[in-house]
């Protein structure tokens, strides 16, 4: 994968997503996710956390099923990086005004035209909200701790205070426990309940 210099390919994240979605063992999920996070560059970590959780960092970019249903001719080889996909989604979400629907579809077509068939399936799942990862927030929190070699309690505390697992993951992998300790209460920022981070839904037993 991309390593410390980043440049993680979307295909690599899509494959980790597939492994996590088809793996029943909690520890195997955690290790697969942690491995992906270790390979991501500093700016890619929050994107990887979001994608592997089945979410878009941008939340909504104005792309519905109508823009995806006709399909796109896939690329033969994977070249798209996480950063390129994230930038593409941001550009799509920024389109507004007269002719925005056509412009947005053109950008979607351009992005999907660079994706392989497997990557396209992953992107459709991501955009439609139908991506089923098995990477619940509690599992991802533990994966961040594993990847950064820090106690999971430190990650949970930081997320409670910061409110963003992606931002906390980037800090943890870059600066370890010292970076996590720097997170504190901020005026106007709500504190997340720790129970959400421990297990947001029913998990399979650890094996």
PLM feature spans:
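N-terminal nucleic-acid-engaging modules of covalent nucleotidyltransferase systems
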Residues: 1-207
């Amino acid at each position: 994968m991309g390593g410390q210099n980043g440049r993680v390919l979307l295909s690599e994240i899509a494959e980790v997503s597939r492994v996590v979605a088809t793996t029943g063992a909690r520890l195997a999920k955690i290790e697969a996710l942690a491995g992906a996070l270790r390979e991501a560059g500093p700016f890619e970590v929050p994107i990887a956390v979001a994608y592997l959780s089945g979410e878009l960092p941008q939340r909504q970019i104005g792309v519905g099923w109508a823009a995806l249903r006709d399909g796109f001719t896939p690329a033969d080889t994977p070249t798209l990086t996480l950063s390129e996909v994230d930038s593409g989604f941001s550009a799509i979400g920024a389109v507004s005004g007269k002719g925005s629907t056509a412009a947005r579809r053109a950008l979607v077509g351009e992005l999907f035209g660079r994706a392989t068939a497997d990557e396209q399936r992953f992107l459709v799942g991501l955009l439609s909200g139908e991506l089923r990862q098995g990477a619940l927030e509690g599992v991802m929190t533990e994966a961040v701790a594993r990847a950064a070699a820090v106690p999971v309690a430190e990650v949970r505390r930081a997320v409670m205070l910061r409110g963003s697992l992606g931002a906390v993951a980037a800090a943890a992998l870059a600066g370890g426990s010292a970076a996590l300790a720097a997170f504190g209460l901020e005026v106007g920022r709500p504190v997340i309940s720790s129970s959400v981070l421990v297990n947001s839904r029913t998990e399979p037993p650890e094996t």
